[in-house]
A protein has these predicted regions:
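Active-site flanking residues adjacent to catalytic metal/cofactor-binding acidic residues
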Residues: 7, 171-172
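N-terminal helical cap/lid subdomain that shapes the substrate entry/recognition surface
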Residues: 2-96, 100-105, 118
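Short glycine/proline-centered loop/turn elements that form peptide/ligand docking sites
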Residues: 96-97, 174-177, 188, 192-195
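Hydrophobic/aromatic residues located in beta-strands of well-ordered beta-sheets
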Residues: 109-111, 138, 168, 188-189
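Conserved SAM-binding loop
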Residues: 13, 43, 109-112, 170-171
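Substrate-recognition "cap/lid" segment bordering the active-site pocket of phosphatases
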Residues: 88, 116-169, 175, 179-183
């Protein structure tokens, strides 16, 4: 029986893949003079935390100060892209209805996302996420959580809900996120689908 629901955010509740890819491409060219292939997005960027992606793009280990500066620069580009495209900057169709229904059923909800704090602050304000999610149940990339496909984001989200991971249901769109949910033993008797 499902006792709590955990959502990935980017690509799941908010389809921002075009905005993310545009921002990553602009950022990678400005900072590393390199392009990013569709295959790299699929396997090495979508669903991953910024530390992993930035070190991959840089081709070397980065200091915390370098990662922080690069994250701020990339996410500033991303937020600017979103703000210039209000027609495509909204929660996915049906998301609000689903969240309202889950809240009405008193199911505890959490978010487990590789997005950094700068983006979380933007999303909370832009989408009024506090209607459904307590701030302490939004697990984001603060630099201390091992990135997906490691189970850490989902385990921390289940812990925030005060539930065993096996009693949670996850909504996720990225291969690395599905692997993370599986690795966390989320919904032990659930099935995993990739679209």
């Amino acid at each position: 029986m499902v006792k709590g629901v955990i959502f990935d955010f980017n690509g799941t509740l908010f389809y921002d893949t075009p905005q993310q890819e545009k921002a990553w491409r602009e950022f990678a060219w400005q900072n590393f003079r390199r392009d990013i292939s569709d295959q790299e997005f699929k396997e090495l960027i979508h669903g991953r935390n910024a530390n992993f992606t930035l070190e991959y793009l840089a081709g070397r280990n980065l200091s915390k100060a370098e990662v922080d500066a690069y994250v701020k620069a990339k996410e500033t580009v991303y937020i600017d892209i979103c703000e210039k495209d209000p027609q495509n900057t909204h929660l996915n169709s049906g998301a609000e209805r689903l969240l309202d229904e889950l809240k009405e059923r008193s199911l505890p909800l959490a978010i487990a996302t590789a997005a950094p704090k700068i983006n979380i602050d933007y999303y909370i304000k832009k989408f009024n996420l506090e209607r459904w999610f307590s701030l302490d149940k939004i697990i984001y990339n603060d630099g201390t959580i091992k990135g997906k496909p490691a189970p850490d984001f989902y385990l921390k989200a289940a812990q925030a809900l005060q539930l065993d991971a096996k009693d949670c249901l996850v909504f996720e769109d990225a291969i690395s996120g599905i692997q993370a949910a599986y690795n966390a033993n989320i919904g032990k008797n659930s099935r995993y689908y990739y679209h």
